[in-house]
């Protein structure tokens, strides 16, 4: 059964693609499964599936689907939060990069770090059984350390990890949390490729793992930005790769998309 909300998301995405990337052959989409898809759910509740959602959109939008659901399992998500864990996403990042014919960067110099203290996600204190706290880990490397992130809203530049934002909300460590439009520059890139990612909050932790394959990555969250506003702010280069990276939860709740 197709929800009205999914139809709304389809129309919203189609409007964006027609406005900015008419006729592009480089538009890709990955649908992020809901954590509930990997859990026992209460009787009578069936979470919307990533496969059906992707199939529906693939039939109606000019996109190539990159299926990442088979790469994910319950342990790839936080215990206390609906989001996925960045340190578990290397295979997802590699699969997406390869599907877009992007060079997969050398990750041999990666280091796994962790924020100090426990991570209490949005489920904390709201479940019948007490949950074990999470640790919020993040991946660093000389390549990621050299990347700069420009925030169009605040006209400021920082890194891919925002430790100040993380003090208030730990998951906002990744790209500073909810942001309408960011531009990541990778001075270590061995090419001039550009990637444009339309994403929700799940993209915050995955996009840094894709950035190494490109000179420039634009990160767009249309939940905070109307269509016409994007054209006033920046022009996207022709021939760029476009990735629609959305969770089932957002696609099935199109009211959040503008």
Where are these regions (language model features)?
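Single conserved hydrophobic/aromatic residue that forms the stacking wall/gate
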Residues: 1-8, 12-13
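Solvent-exposed, acidic/flexible segments
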Residues: 9-10, 47-50, 82, 86-89, ...
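Stable alpha-helical elements in mature extracytoplasmic
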Residues: 10-13, 53, 92, 206
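Histidine-anchored nucleotide/phosphate-binding helix
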Residues: 13-21, 206-210
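Active-site segments of SGNH/GDSL-like serine hydrolases
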Residues: 21-44, 246
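Short, well-ordered alpha-helix to beta-strand connector turns
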Residues: 24, 61, 214, 238-240
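Catalytic His-Asp segment of secreted/periplasmic serine-dependent ester chemistry enzymes
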Residues: 36-37, 42-45, 52, 58-129
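Extracellular/periplasmic envelope-modification machinery, especially enzymes
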Residues: 88-194, 199-212, 216-217, 223-232, ...
């Amino acid at each position: 059964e197709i929800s009205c909300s999914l139809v709304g998301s389809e129309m919203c995405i189609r409007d964006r693609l027609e406005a900015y990337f008419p006729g592009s052959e480089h538009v890709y989409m990955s649908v992020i499964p809901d954590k509930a898809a990997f859990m026992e759910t209460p009787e009578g509740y069936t979470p919307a599936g990533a496969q059906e959602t992707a199939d529906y959109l693939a039939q109606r939008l000019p996109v190539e689907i990159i299926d990442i659901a088979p790469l994910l399992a319950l342990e790839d998500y936080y215990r206390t939060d609906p989001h996925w864990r960045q340190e578990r996403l290397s295979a997802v990042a590699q699969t997406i990069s390869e599907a877009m014919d992007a060079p997969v960067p050398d990750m041999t110099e990666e280091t796994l770090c962790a924020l100090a203290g426990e991570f209490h996600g949005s489920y904390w204190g709201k479940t019948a059984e007490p949950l074990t706290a999470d640790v919020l880990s993040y991946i660093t490397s000389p390549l990621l350390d050299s990347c700069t992130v420009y925030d169009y809203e605040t006209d400021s530049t920082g890194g891919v990890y925002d430790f100040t934002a993380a003090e208030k909300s730990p998951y906002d460590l990744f790209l500073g949390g909810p942001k309408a439009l960011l531009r990541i520059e990778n001075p270590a890139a061995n090419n001039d490729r550009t990637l444009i990612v339309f994403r929700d909050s799940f993209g915050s932790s995955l996009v840094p793992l894709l950035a190494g394959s490109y000179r420039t990555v634009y990160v767009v969250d249309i939940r905070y930005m109307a269509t016409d506003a994007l054209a006033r702010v920046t022009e996207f280069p022709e021939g760029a790769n476009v990735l629609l990276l959305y969770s089932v939860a957002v696609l099935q709740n199109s009211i959040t998309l503008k």
